[in-house]
Amino acid sequence: MFKSGFVTIVGRPNVGKSTLLNAIMKEKLSIVSCRPQTTRNNIQTILTEDNYQLVFVDTPGIHKPKHKLGEYMVKSASDAMKDVDLVLFLINPDEKPGRGDLFIIEQLKEVKVPVFLVLNKIDENPQEKVAETLKTYSELMEFEEIIPISALKGKNIDLLKELMFKYIPEGPQYYPEDMIIDQNERFIVAEIVREKALRLLSEEVPHGIAVEILQMKKNEKGTYHIEGNILCEKNSHKPIIIGKGGSKLKKISQYARQDIEAFLQSKVYIRLWVKVKEEWRDNQSLLKELGYKNMK
């Protein structure tokens, strides 16, 4: 008997959805940063085992939108809860249910599929706090399963997989067994660069950056030559991203190259520039060019 199902992970921004997905896959597939809203596009990730296939949709965190990109991110996360077989609602025990959580719960009450409550970061919180959080959320909604985990340390991830297998239906293998992600290489490369930029930049440049891959060529020796732009919204942000004598941009390039080489399994040369694109997050045509799907 072979089983297959689509699973979506939802939760407030920065709750650890991408870290959880990476723990399940044991691969660095989804951009992970300490900043909220770092996942901007639905990424379908495929886990194939001998007797089942799980297709995960890693969504942006649900938040109040402030621009067209924000509107897209919220719609993208909400749409992901439709037409799936299982929903994982990820929370942190050290945070009381806020307006965002209550908004998500109201949406979850409308779905017709099993919903798991997954408590992350249990290793960072006392048992009393975890128990208190469980009680609070259980009173707000009934969940098919409640699983405490540590996504960062991999605790109870195997248990979570076993429970997901239990709830998904019998079905075909939708993707080839060697396929782990449905985004193209350029998208992944751009996300890796953006992650490094977010990690290295100060709070002066929050989410107003994007990465545009201009060229990605592989020579006869198997080496990739990549060129790209880091886009920012303000002229004042450009020198911050570049750094003194180009030091910050150089670090972004170095750290990105290491992860890109691991992803592509090839040697990589990368050159990055910084360009100012004012209000790019409200530019629908540019958002489409940057890979944000279904923009209307």
Curated annotation (Swiss-Prot):
Q: Where mainly located?
A: cytoplasm
Keyword RNA-binding applies: yes
Outline the segment boundaries, as ranges, of region: G2. 37-41
GO CC term (a single one): cytosol
Q: Which Pfam families match?
A: KH_2, MMR_HSR1
| Keywords (A to Z) from UniProt | Cell membrane, Cytoplasm, GTP-binding, Membrane, Nucleotide-binding, Ribosome biogenesis, RNA-binding, rRNA-binding
Q: Give the record's membrane topology.
A: Peripheral membrane protein
- Could you tell me which PROSITE patterns the record lists for this protein? G_ERA, KH_TYPE_2
Q: Which residues of the sequence carry a binding annotation for GTP?
A: 11-18, 58-62, 120-123
Asked if the Swiss-Prot or TrEMBL record annotates the protein with the keyword Cytoplasm, the reply is yes
InterPro entries reported for this sequence? G_ERA_dom, GTP-bd, GTPase_Era-like, KH_dom-like_a/b, KH_dom_type_2, KH_sf_prok-type, P-loop_NTPase, Small_GTP-bd
Residues crossing the lipid bilayer are none
Region G5, residue ranges = 149-151
Any one GO molecular function term: ribosomal small subunit binding
- From the UniProt annotation, give the residues forming the signal peptide: none
Q: Where is this region: G3?
A: 58-61
Positions of region (G4)? 120-123
- State the compartments where it is located: Cytoplasm; Cell membrane
> What residue stretches are annotated with the Era-type G domain?
3-170
Q: How does it assemble?
A: Monomer.
Q: Which PANTHER family match?
A: GTPASE ERA, GTPASE ERA, MITOCHONDRIAL
Query: According to its UniProt record, which protein family does this protein belong to?
Result: Belongs to the TRAFAC class TrmE-Era-EngA-EngB-Septin-like GTPase superfamily. Era GTPase family.
**Reported function:** An essential GTPase that binds both GDP and GTP, with rapid nucleotide exchange. Plays a role in 16S rRNA processing and 30S ribosomal subunit biogenesis and possibly also in cell cycle regulation and energy metabolism.
Q: What is this protein called?
A: GTPase Era
Biological source species: Clostridium botulinum (strain 657 / Type Ba4)
Highest lineage ranks of the organism? Answer: Bacteria, Bacillati, Bacillota, Clostridia, Eubacteriales
